[in-house]
Amino acid sequence: MKIAVIEDEKPIREGLVHILNKISPEYQVVGSAENGAEGLILLEEEMPDLIMLDIQMPDMDGLQMLKEARARGI
């Protein structure tokens, strides 16, 4: 399962990636991003199966990112 982690707090983002990599060899963290704009690029490039997304982030929050992803057909 391809997983993208989108979280503005670096310790949380890195912790999630670390935990997911240890839980199961079937989990493949395909990338992480620190805001919604970077997250959109990650989604377009990697097309993950699961998105772990923070809702409150600076610049573009998680809800705005989801709306934009839907508008782009991602």
What role is predicted for each listed range?
Residues V17, S32-L50:
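Acidic, metal-coordinating helix/loop segments flanking the phosphotransfer/catalytic sites
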